[in-house]
Amino acid sequence: MDKQQDQQQEARPVLEGPDIARVLTRIAHEIVERAKGADDVVLLGIPTRGVFLARRLADKLEQITERKMPVGSLDITMYRDDLRMHPPRALARTEIPGDGIDGRLVVLVDDVLFSGRTIRAALDALNDIGRPRAVQLAVLVDRGHRELPIRADYVGKNLPTSLRETVKVQLAEEDGRDTVLLGAKPAAPGAHP
């Protein structure tokens, strides 16, 4: 058995498919309530899993409001503050809905909120694209450990973790199943348990 399989066995599910569907439905209702109808809402997912979550959220919002929700994606690769430390990833696509974001309520959608650095990069990228009326954040999981003063407006599950734990979101579109796994980080090479 390889290390990744061993790690998968140690991880325990904290959300499964029906739970994820339920929290997305709740978040959709919260968006409609807070936006007073969601007429000017634009959803932008942060690749990769944030894009899938944004599309699912758009479907839920369409069921509630009976109108098509603009949904797109926001690539933050070139806005990351760790480009010097890690090799660059492949660029994802930024897709802004036809009506743009100027004067609209943009809801950024991501899978896990951790340090806040991804969202800071997303705000920088958004600033280069246009001037929304307001920006809100929806996340499937908030695991804490913020390094920047950023908080989510809509949270599927607050999951306090230690820095020695990992949170892995798996979605059917990318991974073949819907689950959120909480596991232990692998020990550093040469470290003793």
From Swiss-Prot:
It holds the Pfam family Pribosyltran. One of its GO terms (biological process) is regulation of DNA-templated transcription. NCBIfam families: PRK05205.1-3, PRK05205.1-5. Regulates the transcription of the pyrimidine nucleotide (pyr) operon in response to exogenous pyrimidines. Also displays a weak uracil phosphoribosyltransferase activity which is not physiologically significant. Substrate binds at residues 48-49, 89, 93, 110-118, 143, 167. Keywords: Glycosyltransferase, Transcription, Transcription regulation, Transferase. The keyword Hydrolase does not apply. This is Bifunctional protein PyrR. PANTHER family: BIFUNCTIONAL PROTEIN PYRR. Its EC number is 2.4.2.9. It catalyses: UMP + diphosphate = 5-phospho-alpha-D-ribose 1-diphosphate + uracil. One of its GO terms (molecular function) is uracil phosphoribosyltransferase activity. It is an enzyme of class 2 (transferase). Belongs to the purine/pyrimidine phosphoribosyltransferase family. PyrR subfamily. A motif (PRPP-binding) lies at residues 106-118. It comes from Streptomyces coelicolor (strain ATCC BAA-471 / A3(2) / M145).
